[in-house]
Amino acid sequence: MPSKKTDAPKQSEAAGTQTPDRANTNAKLQSLETFRSDATGQALRTNQGVKIADNQNSLKAGARGPSLLEDFIMREKITHFDHERIPERIVHARGTGAHGYFQSYGNHADLTKAGFLQDPDKITPVFVRFSTVQGPRGSGDTVRDVRGFAVKFYTDEGNFDLVGNNMPVFFIQDAIKFPDFVHAVKPEPHNEIPTGGSAHDTFWDFVSLVPESAHMVMWAMSDRAIPRSLRMMEGFGVHTFRLINAEGVASFVKFHWKPRQGVHSLLWDEAQKLAGKDTDFQRRDLWEAIENGDYPEWELGVQIVPEADEHKFDFDLLDPTKIIPEELVPVTPLGKMVLNRNPDNFFAEVEQVAFCPGHIVPGIDFTNDPLLQGRLFSYTDTQISRLGGPNFHQIPINRPVAPNHNNQRDALHQHVVHKGRASYEPNSIDGGWPKETPAAAQDGGFESYQERIDAHKIRQRSESFGDHFSQARLFFQSMSPTEQQHIIKAYSFELGKVEREHIRAREVNEILANIDLKLAAAVAANLGLPAPKAGTVQVKGSQLAQSPALSQMNHPGSVGIKGRKIAVLVANGVDAASVDKLIKALEAHSARPMLLGPTSAPVKATDGKQLPVEASMEGMPSIMFDGIVVPSGKASTDALAASGLAKHFLLEGYKHLKAMVLTKELATGLGLKEDKGLLLADDQKAVDAFVKAVEGHRVWEREAAAEAVPA
């Protein structure tokens, strides 16, 4: 039975050494050991190593006299405190991260000479940072936004950073427009509102004037923008990259991360409530999953396009606002990534980690995607100001496990004591070291792909980038009816927040009407605007009418209800046998049942024993759970039926389409009818049906009935 920790720790918990994930290690984690610090059993000292006798009082002239400037202990402490904060990331400021490893499924030497993709026995350390885009460090986790999905591979050949998102496209095609887009989506400059959202005039003014954003905005208005968990979202490299094998043969590829937990989202009402009830909902979910041993896992795959097939599609592979539909080019699995250890210190690891798309290794190379080309500059440039200079690669979390010797010297925060007299190349003084490494099939120096280029310098967008609506239409028409309704409601909500009617009308008439007239008409009706009769441009036909891979409904996952949080509501008089039976049944499926009571105090079961609860129903409301069960016990269910808090908990769970196990009397009292996910018993048959309903994430068939519930 779950219980709270009540004893004070005998050892320091600063490093979290008591949790199972701390036993997991790899080459990168071992290298970080040099920099870890645990103060257990140590004297309090100044930064200069002087022991401190009194850390409670500043040095004064008499007990009530003036403080003295000579108090070097106070001055050091206050000065350091005054400078603890560093500039936050311009975008993706709000984030969290974890350590883990990548393991290739086999030898992919036919595709690339990158060493970490050639040995199935090789464990490559990784560090992953997930983030939102718009909001500052203190913004909410559950806002409607793109999620960053950045992975740093610490390979034997150097660091490889795959800096992607949970959506496979972006808002713009050329990096020169990135400052304009970010200025538009960020809080408006006159009042710094809104925080963490795009439902405001400047964003919709920009995207309604920039049709290339139409496809990405469709993704942002879908359920993909409000993931249930960071563990339950896909990741994408966004751009087309090249993989090159030892023979110099290149292939175009798109990178994909497929979560074993499936692709699942919050409901919009849940997302808004969670932003207030638990701002840290998603980072807490990731932390607790790893701490409990429910290690998140993704499969890395690539869509492979031979160079000879570059132009066989009705879109341009270099256009970052386009996908390659998986029905045209299936995803080839390469390996798996497992996140199995939480950071020891958030600032040192998550805040100071520096990703850059330009961090690649032999066997991987860029393409001429104009957004990617700008990112190659921007990421390094921003780290220099954010992390205090060009030596940010020496920060422990950023250091490669591969050795790095070169002639880059000095600058702010230099940590390396370089030996020798020659800091240039070639030299004869230090034996010519360090020396270049010729390119080779294995363990060679990096060699850029020898792409032939014959062109005039010109500021012009390729005509092949000109179709802005066919893939947005493909996305919408690939959604289930439920997902389509969520998109309609999202557009209506966001545009309903826009103050200027001409912006709302322009988005409906010049963007949505070119995607789908039914979509445009539905949004127009919700905004009180006339429905457009036709689009404003001739939209190209797509090679596909639908792409089933785009619908989340087709990505249920492969781990059942492992790691899913189930609320078990109890009050005094609960049947102990029923509780025990339900807990054991859920734990058998590796779910995480949690006992919740009217308060945080233990409840008395029918056998006379005190049952400890993990939280109160007020402290952990229904929006934090994937399912709800109520054990039998008349006194307990009567108490819940009489509690406004419990009734709200249950009605809200029903409204949010959660799977539920209730007594018949309790359901009748709440006015709820049995359905595929509302079971009116606690026997094994009901538990089995409950598990199946939780696997489906929501009881979608209930959505129409749930609209009438006022929770």
Swiss-Prot record:
Gene3D superfamilies: 1.20.1370.20, 3.40.50.880, Catalase core domain. Its main location: cytoplasm. Keywords: Cytoplasm, Heme, Hydrogen peroxide, Iron, Metal-binding, Oxidoreductase, Peroxidase. SMART domains: Catalase (SM01060). GO terms for biological process: hydrogen peroxide catabolic process; response to oxidative stress. InterPro entries: Catalase, Catalase_AS, Catalase_clade2, Catalase_clade2_helical, Catalase_core, Catalase_haem_BS, Catalase_immune_responsive, Catalase_large_C. The keyword Amino-acid biosynthesis does not apply. Its EC number is 1.11.1.6. CDD domains: catalase_clade_2, GATase1_catalase. Residues 14-27 have a biased composition (Polar residues). It is found in: Cytoplasm. Belongs to the catalase family. HPII subfamily. Decomposes hydrogen peroxide into water and oxygen; serves to protect cells from the toxic effects of hydrogen peroxide. This is Catalase HPII. It comes from Pseudomonas putida (Arthrobacter siderocapsulatus). The lineage of its organism: Bacteria, Pseudomonadati, Pseudomonadota, Gammaproteobacteria, Pseudomonadales.
